[in-house]
């Protein structure tokens, strides 16, 4: 009983909110067998046909290529593209591609040679003999991307789900009106669908494998049931027809009952989904070594006399396929790539088929109906009821029109699957999906600009930091070079410090002058040099202190100890210098010229007399009658002070003026000197007499 209940539970089908039931319009092409499209005169292969960056070119203009030969290099999430047939590359230039913007992208133009000659192939009949890494690499190098419309690199998707997938879902719903590519593929290649599913099971090791298909495809259901005989691990689930049940989140909810959170993918709940066409491409890449160079494309619409499904090479122009289907242009032809709800109108019929092109719709004016003008939103709420993603289309519309990008992002704009259900039910004929696509593109552009700005800012800040480090290092080198002393400079400083210490020790000693010899000024000169050397040493210490980084972690007691040690070392060095230089004795003095010493002494005496005379003339001479009125003690003191000043002035004059030769000495008047000396003696005698008269014994 429990087993029956469990089996019944496995067959449960859930439903999702929203959705619509538009006319299916599938019988125009689903009852016609698939045809192989002929090669056009020129194939135009865009380099980017998937999500992610385009690959690096590995061919050049004028080069001959073989069928299946890679045209670009595939690294990481970059999927390579391949030559759809053998021929010559006539150009590598921009061309309009299958995109709503109608912008030109870089494409490889190949002129077929008609031979359709393959490159060397290496089929793997038994994939179970290969490890998973080799299988994933082969899928990647085959250029396989999601053929259901997203274009996500299949190998990257499988790599991310190797250890986290519990449920593998094969999407065979194909819910959009007019499109029957997967329907015819399952009818005619059901065995390849099953074999590709088994390869995925070998890679992912899922606990459950489900194939979801709508109940409006009875022929495909019968073909799959026949191919799945004996494959109990693969379960075929037939679901009700409802648009958009083929969406990844919607089909996950229908088959498992699990809802994918906002902003997440099905892989976040352990579910991995692959399209039927992608599964067949995986089988052909692994077993047959055929890269993705062709796919099934539905050509339908009342403007075609022979609608159906075609195996079309990647790069085939749309106009070439339309001609094969009997295209009859209207007055204002409209060709849509994709379905009527999720497709877009082509700006040019020279646009090539790419990996995600599943349908080309060529309707007549009557079929599409008259285009009604867009009107104001009446806030009816029908779009909210129809949205299968649980969004608020009305609010997203206002945010998109008002360019309120952050509000649109916060209202989960990127969870919109662009199914068109909201626009289908809108009574105001508002093209809501177009607004959402434009808003998404603007947000992506702003994000890219912000990312580039952040990268530029990071580079600028890194450059500024590097320049600052280089500046600090350069200044430090300059400071170190400025304070670096050579050996000679160090010796000079030490010698000057030693002389200064020697002079300090001999401050009480007098300078001896030997008669007939010039005075020894070496001590004065040495002191002056020592002071200069000491000043230079202080400057050096200041520079060294400035060059070293400041720190507050130095102990003041340690600093005091270091200073004391430095003073002791300096005193020892000065004493050693003093002991190393012998002091000259007085016996060495007679080596100087005695005549020069005599001349210097005579000049000193003459200058002293002149100074005394000048002092006498500057003060008025008092008469003898006035003398008794003065205080003799003050006069004696004044005379003594005058003599001292005269002696100091004479000594200063002697030091400041150069020593004159013998020939210059007789030029002074000896009589004036004698008069001055006599006057000085008279004043002294008067002062003495006055002092004795005032103070008798």
Curated annotation (Swiss-Prot):
Purpose of the protein: Part of a membrane-bound complex that couples electron transfer with translocation of ions across the membrane.
Binding-site residues, [4Fe-4S] cluster 1: 377, 380, 383, 426
HAMAP family documented for this protein: RsxC_RnfC
Domain 4Fe-4S ferredoxin-type: 366-397, 407-436
GN (gene name): rnfC
Any GO MF annotation of the entry: metal ion binding
Short name of any one Pfam family annotated for the protein: RnfC_N
Species for this entry: Yersinia enterocolitica serotype O:8 / biotype 1B (strain NCTC 13174 / 8081)
Compositionally biased spans, kind Low complexity: 597-615, 635-653
Keywords from the named record: 4Fe-4S, Cell inner membrane, Cell membrane, Electron transport, Iron, Iron-sulfur, Membrane, Metal-binding, Repeat, Translocase, Transport
Name the UniProt record assigns to this protein: Ion-translocating oxidoreductase complex subunit C
Predominant cellular place of this UniProt entry's protein: membrane
Matches recorded under InterPro entries: 4Fe4S_Fe-S-bd (IPR017896), 4Fe4S_Fe_S_CS (IPR017900), Ion_transpt_RnfC/RsxC (IPR010208), Nuo51_FMN-bd (IPR011538), Nuo51_FMN-bd_sf (IPR037225), RnfC_N (IPR026902), Soluble_ligand-bd (IPR019554)
EC assignment: 7.-.-.-
Record's subcellular location: Cell inner membrane
């Amino acid at each position: 009983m429990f087993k029956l209940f469990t089996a019944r539970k496995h067959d449960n089908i859930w439903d999702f909110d929203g959705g619509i039931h538009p006319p299916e319009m599938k019988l125009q092409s689903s009852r016609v067998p698939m045809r192989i499209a002929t090669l056009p005169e020129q194939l135009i292969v865009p380099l980017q046909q998937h999500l992610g960056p385009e690959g690096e070119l590995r061919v050049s203009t004028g080069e001959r290529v073989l069928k299946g030969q890679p045209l670009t290099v595939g690294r990481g999430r970059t999927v390579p593209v391949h030559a759809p047939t053998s021929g010559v590359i006539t150009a590598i230039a921009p061309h309009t591609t299958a995109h709503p913007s109608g912008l030109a992208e870089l494409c490889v133009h190949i002129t077929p040679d008609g031979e359709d000659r393959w490159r060397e192939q290496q089929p793997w009949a038994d994939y179970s003999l290969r490890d998973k890494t080799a299988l994933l690499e082969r899928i990647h190098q085959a250029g396989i991307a999601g053929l259901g419309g997203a274009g996500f690199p299949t190998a990257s998707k499988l790599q991310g789900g190797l250890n986290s997938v519990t449920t593998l879902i094969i999407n065979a719903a194909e819910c959009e009106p007019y499109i029957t590519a997967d329907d015819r593929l399952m009818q005619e290649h059901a065995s390849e669908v099953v074999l590709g599913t088994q390869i995925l099971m070998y890679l992912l090791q899922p606990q459950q494998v489900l194939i979801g298909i709508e109940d409006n495809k009875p022929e495909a259901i019968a073909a799959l049931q026949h191919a799945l005989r004996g494959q109990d691990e693969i379960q075929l689930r037939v679901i009700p027809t409802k648009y958009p049940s083929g969406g990844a989140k919607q089909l996950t909810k229908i088959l498992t009952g699990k809802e994918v959170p906002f902003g997440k993918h099905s892989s976040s709940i352990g579910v991995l989904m692959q399209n039927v066409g992608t599964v067949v491409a995986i089988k052909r890449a692994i077993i047959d070594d055929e890269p993705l160079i062709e796919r099934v494309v539905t050509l339908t619409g009342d403007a075609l006399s022979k609608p159906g499904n075609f195996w079309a090479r990647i790069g085939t122009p749309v106009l070439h396929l339309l001609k094969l289907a009997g295209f009859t242009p209207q007055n204002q032809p409209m060709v849509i790539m994709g379905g009527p709800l999720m497709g877009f109108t082509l700006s040019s019929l020279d646009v090539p088929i790419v990996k995600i092109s599943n349908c080309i719709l060529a309707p007549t004016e009557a079929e599409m109906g008259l285009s009604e003008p867009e009107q104001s939103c009446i806030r009816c709420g029908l779009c909210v009821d129809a949205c299968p993603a649980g969004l608020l289309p009305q609010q997203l519309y206002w945010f998109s029109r008002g360019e309120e990008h952050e509000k649109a992002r916060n209202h989960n704009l990127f969870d919109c699957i662009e199914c068109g259900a909201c626009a289908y039910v809108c009574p105001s004929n508002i093209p809501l999906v177009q607004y959402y696509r434009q808003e998404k593109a603007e947000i992506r552009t702003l994000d890219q600009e912000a990312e580039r700005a952040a990268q530029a800012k990071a580079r600028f800040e890194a450059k500024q930091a590097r320049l600052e480090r280089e500046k600090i290092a350069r200044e430090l080198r300059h400071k170190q070079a400025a304070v670096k002393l050579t050996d000679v400079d160090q010796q000079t400083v030490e010698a000057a410090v030693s002389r200064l210490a020697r002079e300090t020790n001999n401050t009480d000693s007098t300078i001896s002058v030997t008669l007939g010899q010039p005075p020894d000024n070496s001590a004065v000169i040495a002191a002056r040099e020592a002071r200069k050397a000491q000043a230079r040493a202080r400057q050096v210490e200041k520079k060294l202190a400035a060059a070293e980084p400041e720190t507050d972690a130095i102990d003041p007691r340690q600093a005091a100890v270091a200073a004391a040690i430095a003073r002791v070392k300096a005193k020892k060095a000065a004493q050693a210098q003093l002991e190393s230089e012998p002091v000259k004795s007085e016996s060495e003095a007679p080596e100087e010229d005695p005549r020069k010493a005599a001349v210097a002494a005579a000049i000193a005496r003459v200058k002293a007399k002149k100074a005394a005379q000048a002092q006498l003339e500057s003060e008025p001479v008092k008469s003898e009658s006035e003398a008794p009125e003065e205080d003799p003690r003050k006069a004696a003191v004044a005379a003594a002070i005058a003599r001292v000043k005269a002696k100091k002035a004479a000594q200063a004059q002697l030091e400041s003026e150069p020593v004159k030769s013998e020939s210059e000495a007789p030029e002074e008047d000896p009589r004036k000197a004698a008069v001055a000396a006599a006057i000085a003696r008279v004043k002294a005698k008067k002062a003495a007499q006055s002092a004795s008269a005032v103070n008798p014994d």
